[in-house]
Amino acid sequence: MDLSIPNPVADTTKAADAGTAGGQPLEIDALIVGAGPVGLFQVFELGLLEIKAHVIDSLKVVGGQCVELYPDKPIYDIPAVPSCTGQELTDNLLKQIEPFGPTFHLGQEVAVVERRDDGRFFVETSLGTRFITKTIFIAAGVGSFQPRTLKVDGIDKFDGKQLFYRVKDPSRFHGRNLVIVGGGDSALDWTLDLVGKAESVVMIHRRDGFRAAPASVAKMKELCEQMEMQFLVGQIGGYEEKDGVLTEIKVTGADGVTRRLPVDDVLVFFGLSPKLGPIAEWGLDLERKQIKVDTEKFQTNIPGIFAVGDINTYPGKKKLILSGFHEAALAAFGAAPYIFPEKKIHMQYTTTSPKLHKVLGVESPVFD
């Protein structure tokens, strides 16, 4: 599935939002905030309990940080999957949740959350989509995330034209004179990827020390020795332009000397600045911009609101996709009594349960 044109997801978004913006709220059982891997797996775990979910995300595509920041980088710590990219993980999760028919509401944030007298929540998004829901699952990763920007007066006018903080189409930089700024894994990874494809690559970092894999640093230094690229210790302090086109940047080195480098594109990787956004105003118990939860149900201090994935915190928390999947399973069971208060939930297994096979749309195996 090409998530740059997410047809089935887009269709559910349009159909749902067209019917609710300014009209009657959708009355639902579960609302998931965040369409990254953990949010998608939350759909699956709820679906096994016959709970249909609606999913909101501020991005216009499904996949969260995996698709937005590293769609082509391999992930090695998903159980039984030796290696997959962020895009492949997202595609597989979308396939896995197909039987449950989730409805996606993309390109919008939750703006209002109010507790109703009947115990349910009224929720409204930034686009006016409204819900009345029994439960809320916050799977928003680090919240809304923004790249830390290059602090040079006036250079922001080239943002998205010749100044980039993310790489979505690597081929766009082939045959170009590139300056890559930063000292972390992203800066090193893209430097190594683009050397030999770009016309020239100059990497700039404020010091001769890196927060990246040692093998990547060693490879970069080897390429410098082979005259395949350059590395400069320094900081960008200015630029030159001609007819509205960025033509040079000015780099001041540790020796105090300012050098001028011809450039077609500047790629900046200073990391991300996470922002909780409207979630910070919901009355949740927060600790250092993360939501405190229990470890039995991964419920917040507000009954009926759960938090899973990187956005939550508890003693021993590890920010792993694997951990988020575990949290989603327990959160689904924790939410079931709010949705089916009279129903006793029995533990069933997808290997043996005819009921789950029916829910999943698969045939029950027959054993001799």
From Swiss-Prot:
Enzyme class, spelled out: oxidoreductase
InterPro entries on file: FAD/NAD-bd_sf, FAD/NAD-binding_dom, Fd--NADP_Rdtase_type_2, Ferredoxin-NADP_redctase_2
Transmembrane segments: none
GO molecular function: ferredoxin-NADP+ reductase activity; flavin adenine dinucleotide binding; NADP binding
Cofactor(s) it depends on: FAD
Domain of life: Bacteria
E.C. number: 1.18.1.2
Keyword Oxidoreductase: yes
Record field: catalytic activity: 2 reduced [2Fe-2S]-[ferredoxin] + NADP(+) + H(+) = 2 oxidized [2Fe-2S]-[ferredoxin] + NADPH
Cofactor descriptive note: Binds 1 FAD per subunit.
Amino acids binding FAD: 57, 65, 70, 110, 145, 310, 351
Sorted UniProt keywords: FAD, Flavoprotein, NADP, Oxidoreductase
Similarity comment: family membership: Belongs to the ferredoxin--NADP reductase type 2 family.
HAMAP family: FENR2
Quaternary organization: Homodimer.
Stated name of the protein: Ferredoxin--NADP reductase 2
